[in-house]
Amino acid sequence: MPQTKHPLPDTQLLTPGTLSRLTARSPSAHKGQFGHLLLIGGDRGFGGAALLCAESALRSGAGMVSLATRREHVPAALARVPEVMALGTDSANQLMGLLEQASVIVAGPGLGQAAWGRSLLSAAANAPRPQVWDADALNLLAKGGLSLPSGSVITPHPGEAARLLGISTAQVQADRPAAVRALSKKYTVVAVLKGAGSLIASPDGRLSRCDRGHPAMATAGLGDVLAGLVGALLAQGLPAFDSACLAVWLHAVAGEHQGKLGRGLAASDLIPAIRQLLEEQSPCLK
């Protein structure tokens, strides 16, 4: 697995004491105060990625979660997470109302790189909202012609990072700090370079490292859960860099807790663990 375990200059290690916290909620709080997250993803055959991301966002505290996906995935979404507002979406025109309502957009889980995914992502890119791009949104970004609004986050693994930078995966791995900084500078976003020893870089030069996690986390769907978590923290008012750092730490520590059972960890196992850790770190009530 990718490694960033050795000491790095000018890098802050993520610990409970260095992480930002969500503010406690007023007894009179309502859902509109905690953001409306729109998730765009789930092309044919990849609905599970979108559902994992949507459930993660909901369970991490977003006030409302909408899902724009292929219409054949809507029944599964309603059955698994009825609290998520799932809309069968055939074209970018159907996104326009949702884009206006959303406060945060997450794009990429199960999106695919065919015409459907490209058109939806192009529409999202034009919305002046903080965004989280993962998976195929990053592969489409690497092809050019798209940019992200300010206050956004990208979450590539080393292969995606290599495509975004136009270099080899080996070159990314040879100097991960330089790679994540280059990503942040090139796209003017907060960049998360995933892997053992995940790194988070911001355009203003900050760099943080997470040394938590477990090898049982080497399984599909973990990135979808992370993307939903980052989006939920953004929706609740944390700045992009703080959201990314807190999300990476919560995700890794949840993986440690669930990884104690060994092989067979499923991405969905992390969601209740993340919820518990978030409550311990940022209590809902004072």
Enumerate the predicted regions with their spans.
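Small-residue (G/A/S/T)-rich helix-start motifs and N-terminal tracts that mark the onset
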Residues: M1-V132, N139-V153, P158, A162-K286
